[in-house]
């Protein structure tokens, strides 16, 4: 009986030692894997839905994501509510706020693509864009002016406060007033192909009013036209 107990004890002791040794080997392998991956590694292929690139302190600098998991943007350090955005890349500045990006989407009925550069604390001021809804299509380079008096954070807070009042008329009137003052941004220049199939250079003044159009229309006719501040055509001087 004593011999059997001694044998059982030795077996139990062996299992304990084996378990400890196996745990140590697994822990060592896990540590080596962790250490290797955190000090550079090479991968032939990786499949993910989203990648966040951050600084050492955790500040977000770049997001690469599919449409479903795309970042909604950060303004004044606050993440915006989730919204529909195309797959692609979103850029963030040294302070962690969104400062541009490259997004795209497309199917048979509609497609769009845009590479945007944002003014500091404001919306886009330069964009290379393409939009197609199956019937109308335009693409080219567009530029805007943005007001320092109405940065994106301030505009978002104003919009949210008005929306909370449940007064759509007041919201619409306020936005119209801001646009009239040029506080929501004004398009200044477009170089490309328009919805009506004209290709050329189109310039607006600081109120967003069309002033100069130079290009070729859909019938291959020359466009060389100026406009006054209320939209009346004026003659441009030309040596053509």
Name each region found by the language model.
Residues 1-37:
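Single-pass membrane-anchoring alpha-helices
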Residues 30-82, 86-240:
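Parallel beta-helix/beta-solenoid repeats that form elongated, surface-exposed shafts/blades used
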């Amino acid at each position: 009986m004593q011999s059997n107990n001694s044998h059982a004890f030795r077996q139990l002791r062996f299992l304990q030692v084996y378990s400890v040794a196996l745990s140590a080997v697994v822990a060592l392998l896990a540590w080596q894997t962790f250490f290797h991956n955190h000090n550079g590694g090479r991968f032939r292929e990786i499949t993910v839905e989203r990648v966040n690139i951050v600084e050492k302190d955790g500040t977000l600098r770049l997001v690469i994501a599919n449409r479903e998991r795309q970042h909604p943007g950060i303004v004044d350090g606050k993440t915006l509510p989730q919204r529909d955005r195309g797959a692609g890349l979103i850029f963030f500045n040294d302070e962690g706020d969104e400062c541009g990006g490259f997004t795209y989407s497309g199917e048979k009925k509609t497609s769009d693509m845009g590479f945007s550069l944002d003014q500091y604390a404001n919306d886009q001021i330069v964009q290379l864009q393409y939009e197609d809804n199956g019937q109308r299509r335009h693409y080219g380079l567009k530029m805007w002016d943005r007001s320092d008096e109405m940065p994106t954070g301030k505009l978002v807070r104003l919009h949210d406060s008005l929306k909370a009042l449940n007064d759509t008329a007041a919201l619409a009137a306020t936005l119209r007033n801001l646009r009239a003052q040029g506080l929501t941004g004004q398009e200044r220049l477009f170089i490309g192909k328009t919805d009506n199939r004209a290709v050329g250079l189109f310039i607006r003044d600081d109120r967003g009013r069309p002033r100069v159009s130079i290009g070729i229309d859909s019938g291959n006719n020359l466009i060389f036209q100026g406009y006054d501040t209320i939209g009346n055509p004026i003659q441009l001087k030309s040596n053509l």
